[in-house]
């Protein structure tokens, strides 16, 4: 029996919309990352982007458990000496709610060009509205 290898031009990609309201951040992000990679499909091939497009709505209503809202810290660097910046989860969810889900999912995707291609298929919106109605996304319950 010959091993099946998916071809990038023959992969069928669907659009799904996920409501993040009341969902736990890590559990939601791991399922989204798995869908972006295409691991739920029978034709999954590790070196080919076989994943679907995922639209996340209500990103501002995602939750974390325990004390993580005050304790979880996100770091970035300005590339200048002494330029490390930090912000906690509860401040970031108010300022840029999309970034919380994007960073969680991005950390679960592979590094390199293939991971960046998978990450580009993620669309995150703070509110309940999105502008991908033309793609006719299906509702995905996670």
UniProtKB/Swiss-Prot annotation:
One Gene Ontology CC term in the entry? cytosolic large ribosomal subunit
In terms of domain of life, where is this protein from?
Bacteria
Key words, A-Z? Ribonucleoprotein, Ribosomal protein
Molecular function per GO? mRNA binding; structural constituent of ribosome
* Signal peptide (UniProt feature, chain positions): none
Single GO BP term:
negative regulation of translation
Task: Answer whether the UniProt record assigns the keyword Electron transport to this protein.
Answer: no
Q: How does it assemble?
A: Part of the 50S ribosomal subunit.
What this chain does, per the entry, is described as: This protein is one of the early assembly proteins of the 50S ribosomal subunit, although it is not seen to bind rRNA by itself. It is important during the early stages of 50S assembly.
Identify the NCBIfam families for this entry: rplM_bact
What family name appears in the similarity comment? Belongs to the universal ribosomal protein uL13 family.
Name listed for the protein in its UniProt record: Large ribosomal subunit protein uL13
Q: Which organism is it from?
A: Vibrio vulnificus (strain YJ016)
Upper classification of the organism: Bacteria, Pseudomonadati, Pseudomonadota, Gammaproteobacteria, Vibrionales
């Amino acid at each position: 029996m010959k091993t099946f290898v998916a071809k990038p031009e023959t992969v069928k990609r669907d659009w799904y919309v996920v409501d993040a309201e009341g969902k736990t951040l890590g559990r939601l992000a791991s399922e989204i990352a798995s869908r972006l990679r295409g691991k739920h499909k029978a034709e999954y091939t590790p070196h080919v982007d076989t994943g679907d497009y995922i639209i996340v709505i209500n990103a501002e209503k995602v939750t974390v458990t325990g004390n993580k809202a005050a304790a979880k810290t996100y770091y970035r660097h300005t590339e200048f000496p002494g330029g490390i910046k930090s912000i906690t989860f509860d401040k970031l969810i108010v300022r840029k709610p999309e970034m919380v889900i994007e960073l969680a999912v991005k950390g679960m995707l592979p590094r390199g060009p293939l991971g960046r291609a998978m990450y580009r298929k993620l669309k995150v919106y703070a509110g309940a509205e999105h502008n991908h109605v033309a793609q006719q996304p299906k509702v995905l319950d996670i």
